[in-house]
């Protein structure tokens, strides 16, 4: 939980929106994606782990190149002070105007207690994010993301996918629609 501010800033800088590194690299600079994102997802219980989620929507014939490019930026995060400044301002601005209302008030309270926190986590994140630097984001990426083992989920027509390449990433399990949806 002490890492919450760094992770929030990492998510905003690296994988959050159209100004984030993932979108800029995968879609704008390399033309490999219709859409893309990556983020660390916080656990819902204090004994659980964070989960890393990355997504790229690309053409089947660009799959190999897109996976390799995504792995490259995940393991060697591009650093841009200008992009960091934009991300930091966006996160601080959003937190400044966000409000927890309705049933979310009690859900937030209970969620914080479940995590062992007695004050709203948003307060700590808001106060700490304003002092973070690009080096802090890089440190979070080094600790939580870089050089990990990932599970890939590929959705597409098997006839159009390079299954031999997929086998180089690990065991390949081909699922039918019935396997996925149960009918």
Locations of the language-model features?
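Proteolytic maturation boundary segments
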Residues: 23, 134-183
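Structured mid-domain segments that build the active-site/substrate or prosthetic-cofactor binding neighborhood
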Residues: 16
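M16 family metallopeptidases and their MPP-like homologs
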Residues: 1-12, 23-76, 82-134, 147-155
């Amino acid at each position: 939980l002490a890492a919450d501010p760094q992770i929030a800033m990492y998510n905003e800088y690296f994988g959050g929106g159209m100004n984030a590194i993932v979108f800029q690299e995968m879609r704008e600079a390399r033309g490999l994606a219709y859409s893309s994102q990556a983020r660390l997802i916080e656990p819902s219980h204090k004994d659980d782990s964070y989960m890393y989620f990355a997504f790229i929507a690309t053409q089947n014939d660009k799959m190999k190149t897109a996976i390799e490019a995504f792995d490259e930026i995940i393991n060697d995060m591009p650093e841009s002070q200008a992009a960091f400044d934009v991300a930091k301002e966006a996160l601080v601005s959003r937190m400044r105007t966000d409000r927890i209302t309705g049933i979310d008030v009690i859900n937030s309270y209970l969620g914080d207690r479940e995590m062992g926190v007695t004050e709203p986590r948003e307060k700590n994140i808001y106060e700490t994010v304003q002092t973070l630097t690009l080096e802090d984001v890089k440190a979070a990426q080094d600790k939580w993301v870089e050089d990990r083992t990932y599970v890939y989920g590929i959705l597409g027509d098997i006839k159009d996918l390079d299954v031999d390449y997929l086998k180089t990433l690990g065991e390949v399990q081909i699922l039918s629609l019935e396997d996925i949806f149960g009918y």
